[in-house]
Amino acid sequence: MDSRNADSGISFQGRIDRKTHELGHLKTAFPQWEQLSKEEKLDASRKVKPVAEDTVYNVTTDSLHEYFVDNLDPDNTNTEANISVDFLGLGTDAGSGTSTADTDLNSRVFEEPVTDVADNGKELLASTFLDSTEGNGNDFDELGLFSGDPANLTNAEVFLINHATFAAVTKDSTKTVTLDVTLTFSDV
């Protein structure tokens, strides 16, 4: 007879690392900065010490949990069975907090396609690079990953994956910001 551990489960943890760089420092380190692609700028910025950095942890959403449960069902043939991390949304209302029931950020004011995604089987790293021309004039203090363009949240395939709040970063044309979101899946 097979035995099962009824107390076992899976744990989701999200860690967000934010690094802010001064544009002048990046241009000094990489004189060809303006000619680099977004992916190359992300890689280059990792080689320069940031002027500010922060690490926070987040909640993963009920929608993500339901996605995993639904996709463990062998009878599930829905097209939603194959999603990816596509967009990062940024908002300006950390004061309202986060909840696993969230379906969007509290005050989403900016969204950007994820720049790079990598996984090692148990962790997914989604990195988004905001260039000096992007998201300016905002005091970002919340973020979330989306399974598609958040402008299409009425589509069942597009949902908020995680939601985090952090110390506000004022985005202007003198700064770049790198947001690394690591989702870790482990046994409890």
Model regions and ranges:
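Small cysteine-rich, disulfide-bonded extracellular modules of the LU/uPAR three-finger superfamily
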Residues: M1-D141, G148-V188
